[in-house]
Amino acid sequence: VLMSKGFAKEEPNKQKRRKAWIRYEREYSLSAGHLDWHDPGNGKQVYVVLDDASRKILAGGEFENATEENSTKLVEEVISKYGYIQIIRETITDHGTQFYANKRDKDGKAEHGFERFLEEHNIKHILCRYKHPQSNGKVEKWFDLYRIHRKRFPTFEEFIEWYNNRPHGSLNLRRAE
């Protein structure tokens, strides 16, 4: 309609074929975990380790402060719970100070507890692009569910139990399966 009235014109660059969208997903559970902190505005900081393949919450908690110690503590929890199957191979995080030291020496090295912990356990640390929350979108989407549904449950643990055992929309399985 707009073209017939002279308000728009064809743009050949927009007609070019675009790359097909590829679903980003690991094949096996425990191959990668998405980690992030969230401030829901209730005085607590929420931190979770979300499995990339199944979307299951492997560990999580509501804390007073978002710290590198708390970040390390939950990855340790994942290793102690699931290490008999496999130690998580990669973590995907943003550049938050809980995960990454922004001040580095000329060789790119820094003294940071969380980074040192990952190195000691041979876990690869994948950093998302700056100001690009889509890179860690699976955990960002989980925070939306947290905001909507958390108030229905008396404890964080009950909320996680509900989340991990509800049917997964695209897999026709529960996250725990």
State each model region's role.
Residues 8, 37-46, 54-158, 162:
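RNase H-like DDE/DDD metal-dependent nuclease/strand-transfer catalytic core used by mobile genetic elements
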